[in-house]
Amino acid sequence: MSTELQSELIQAVELRRNFAIISHPDAGKTTLTEKLLLYGGAIHEAGAVKARRAQRKATSDWMAMEQQRGISITSTVLQFEYQKCQINLLDTPGHQDFSEDTYRTLAAADNAVMLIDAAKGLEPQTRKLFEVCKLRGIPIFTFINKLDRPGREPLELLDEIEQELGLQTYAVNWPIGMGDRFKGVFDRHKQQIHLFERSAHGSREARDTIVELGDPRIEEKLEQSLYYQLKNDLELLEGVGPELDLQLVHEGKMTPVFFGSAMTNFGVELFLKYFLEYALKPGSHYSSVGEVAPTYPEFSGFVFKLQANMDPKHRDRVAFIRVCTGKFEKDMMVNHARIGKLIRLSRPQKLFAQERESIDVAYPGDVIGLNNPGVFAIGDTIYTGQKLEYEGIPYFSPELFASLRNPNPSKSKQFQKGVAELREEGAVQIMYSTDEAKRDPILAAVGQLQFEVVQFRLQNEYGVETILDLLPYSVARWVEGGWEALEKVGRIFNTTTVKDSMGRPVLLFRNEWNCQQLLGDHPELKLSAIAPVFSSQQPVEE
């Protein structure tokens, strides 16, 4: 590798940060995302993208159904600069029915921001997503939101995180008051109080007054009771709380905690500044040839998301690529690990929700969009130089099943195309009956809303109305060893055998009891709630 390229890669990695936000629905994720973009200069007013009509819709919620319902149902990538750093914000679905899409997004993230509602504390979806971060070893930064509303005591919230998640906590800032009495936050590192003025509905950057802790004006600006409460809290934190240890943070054992209000912009910029200082830079990725450092001179990356029809005018399909190593350049030739072919990466795009612009280069930590004419699948690796392949992204056990019918034979081509493209992008898992006479696809989902999205998009994007027939199953298990292992068992009862999109056998059960009964009768049968990962395997066409 040339010294010039080595220096270029080191500098690029140094200036990049990459993170996803995880939260329970209604914790304020979309609002926090908007405010981070506001401070990053990517938008001038929260809810309106720079150079776009003032539609006042959330920047990250671009899909028609999202804007109709006011919920986030698909992950997007939002890229912006702040203090010379290139930040890739991997926005995840806020609705719990789309946790699988969130998991795929976390595969591309170096850090996670755990957003918590101060009134509610830890909630079920947050706990689930924390476990995913823990499995992947992703550092977690906590932002406790909605301090401008009545909520639980800050010390109680820290204790809940420590007791339930097993994480040490370090409060980087500390709230002064809560609800109507919320006055700002205290920066423990700089020993400064940030007193905030409310901006117009939080749509503009908040102006704050910074006062040193020993400044005599503090008692004038704060109610006496709040001032003494702050002093007592700080003494307690210093006396019993741990010191900040960035090694523990990067190992996922300690979480820096920030308090604020995304709606009114309190504490958002302070969080962003410290996040850039503390967060992991793009690091090594495990591959078929071992760990590969981001400064490895050859280019490599993997597909973590596919999205069809981001631009309905052009009926396009985009593959989201996380750059892992080396330098990406427009029109470069790369090896496609799964299909074993050389392909040209033309028309690369920088992504900003639905907005896109052409780019010429990208570096480790960046996410780029590539037009996807049926070449890419989720989990695919592309590379130059020595052959390598990154770990695939597994599918998880769905809990709801339904047969999808097309009542209009004249729309069969559009129906098949729509189902195939939605399957490829992971909108829902698709399975098929082993009975060749039954051609209707079986949708397998984590939540009911996934079914609604599939039907909505088939009609909105492909012009196909469909009929959904719910099936009486709630448990799916993949058979380890495939069809051969299943044939050795012989005839089995109280289960239905189907095949997934890769042609692998899956057993569907009405309940967990039926599943356990089968395992009791056939202990030699090995079942898995997670689909085996074979990134080189091709989907079957039905």
Curated annotation (Swiss-Prot):
Locations listed in the record: Cytoplasm
tr-type G domain location: 14-283
Domain of life of the organism encoding this protein: Bacteria
Residues given in the record as GTP binding sites: 23-30, 91-95, 145-148
One annotated GO molecular function: translation release factor activity, codon nonspecific
Cross-referenced InterPro entries: EF-G-like_DII, EFG_III/V, G_TR_CS, P-loop_NTPase, PrfC, RF3_C, RF3_dom_3_sf, RF3_GTP-bd
Keywords: Cytoplasm, GTP-binding, Nucleotide-binding, Protein biosynthesis
A GO cellular component annotation in the UniProt record: cytosol
Single biological process term from Gene Ontology: regulation of translational termination
Alphabetical list of PANTHER family matching this protein: PEPTIDE CHAIN RELEASE FACTOR RF3
Similarity comment: Belongs to the TRAFAC class translation factor GTPase superfamily. Classic translation factor GTPase family. PrfC subfamily.
Function field: Increases the formation of ribosomal termination complexes and stimulates activities of RF-1 and RF-2. It binds guanine nucleotides and has strong preference for UGA stop codons. It may interact directly with the ribosome. The stimulation of RF-1 and RF-2 is significantly reduced by GTP and GDP, but not by GMP.
Record-given protein name: Peptide chain release factor 3
Source organism: Nostoc punctiforme (strain ATCC 29133 / PCC 73102)
Gene: prfC
